[in-house]
């Protein structure tokens, strides 16, 4: 079983970057692009909880992550020369290669002795990335690490994909002798690899002219370069796996999860998360949601909650957090920890801000 505990490491701070452009799902019309013919704006909002999203067809995940990281590093007054690693968790890298983390090392002005690596995960990605960063930091060999996580500029036409929004977050992790650290549980079910996927684009099904031919899928007109999701399969997976993972983590490490201050779940959709809350018998006041204003932001969704929903309550105050990410893969991860985290103000990035675009 994938349970483990990491001590002597802590989260020092969290920040987030989003596009300044806001798209309202109430303004979308049935039949536009991949919007289904029977699309009802109000019904969609009521079903998913997503009213509006931050969208950019220009800015990449690394652009938003760079903005978030710059803000966080400045707020923490970290000397960039002391940052030992940068981890980039995303399914929307700048290029097929090189790794986007390498580009961010240079763009952020980090040392050439810096460890840099990409992690190709989605909804569970922040928890996985956190486990890697904390593992590196716990020994003291790497003392400061920046974890950037998120997705943006997907292959689907952004304004016409009513569920997903663009965002990237930066999390600062450092070595801290004696820190209680983190308790993790992870799982994978690769038999559901096609529950959420882009069929063409990789080396298995390479891009060809036919990749852009529209076909009907789950009531939508789509092409093979867009995200295909088996809605009911994903819903069933989410409402089953997330509660089980939380309970397994608590049972394995012998703690009462009801005593935790905050429960931060991946922001998949409102109905799914409502059922998870009911299954775990949680106080809804302890389970913040950002879907209404930001949609599903993939691996950014958990840390984005800290920035956009509870910053004023938790900033620099010791709190107990239980976080669970679940989705594409199929993959899931849950983490429990207690800490006082500095939470930076949200960074809004304008499409026209040329300083956020990195050109080789």
Task: Mark where each language-model region is.
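A structural motif shared across PLP-dependent enzymes of the aminotransferase-like
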Residues: 31-36, 92-103, 268-271
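Claisen-condensing/thiolase-fold acyl-transfer catalytic domains that form or cleave C-C bonds
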Residues: 62, 66-69, 92-93, 106, ...
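Phosphate/pyrophosphate-binding loops at sites that engage ATP/ADP/AMP, CoA/4′-phosphopantetheine
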Residues: 68-84, 244-261, 309-314
């Amino acid at each position: 079983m994938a349970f483990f505990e990491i001590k002597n490491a802590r989260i020092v701070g969290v920040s987030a970057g989003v596009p300044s452009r806001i798209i309202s799902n109430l303004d979308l019309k049935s039949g536009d692009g991949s919007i289904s013919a029977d699309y009802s704006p109000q019904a969609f909002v009521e079903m998913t909880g997503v009213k509006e999203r931050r969208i950019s067809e220009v800015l990449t995940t690394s652009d938003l992550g760079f903005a978030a990281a710059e803000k966080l590093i400045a707020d923490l007054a970290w000397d960039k020369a002391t940052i030992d690693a940068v981890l980039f968790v995303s399914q929307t890298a700048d290029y097929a290669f090189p790794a986007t983390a390498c580009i961010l090392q240079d763009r952020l002005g980090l040392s050439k002795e810096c460890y840099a690596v990409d992690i190709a995960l989605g909804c569970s990605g922040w928890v996985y990335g956190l486990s890697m960063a904390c593992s590196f930091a716990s020994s003291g060999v790497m003392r400061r690490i920046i974890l950037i996580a998120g997705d943006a500029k997907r292959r689907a036409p952004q304004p016409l994909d009513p569920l997903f929004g663009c965002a990237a977050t930066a999390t600062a992790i450092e070595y801290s002798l004696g820190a209680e650290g983190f308790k993790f549980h992870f799982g994978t079910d690769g038999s559901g690899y096609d529950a959420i996927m882009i069929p063409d684009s990789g080396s298995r099904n390479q891009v060809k002219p036919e990749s852009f031919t529209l076909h009907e899928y789950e009531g939508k007109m789509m092409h093979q370069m867009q995200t295909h999701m088996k809605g009911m399969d994903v819903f069933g997976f989410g409402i089953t796996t997330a509660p089980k993972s939380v309970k397994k983590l608590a049972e394995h490490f012998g703690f009462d999860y009801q005593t935790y201050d905050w429960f931060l779940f991946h922001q998949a959709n409102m109905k799914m998360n409502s059922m998870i809350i009911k299954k775990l018998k949680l106080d809804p006041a302890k389970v913040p949601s950002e879907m209404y204003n930001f949609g599903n932001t993939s691996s950014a969704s958990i840390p984005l909650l800290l920035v956009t929903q509870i910053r004023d309550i938790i900033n620099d105050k010791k709190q107990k957090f239980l976080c669970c990410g679940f989705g594409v893969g199929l993959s899931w991860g849950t983490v429990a920890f207690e800490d006082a985290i500095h939470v930076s103000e949200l960074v809004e990035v304008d499409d026209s801000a040329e300083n956020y675009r990195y050109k080789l």
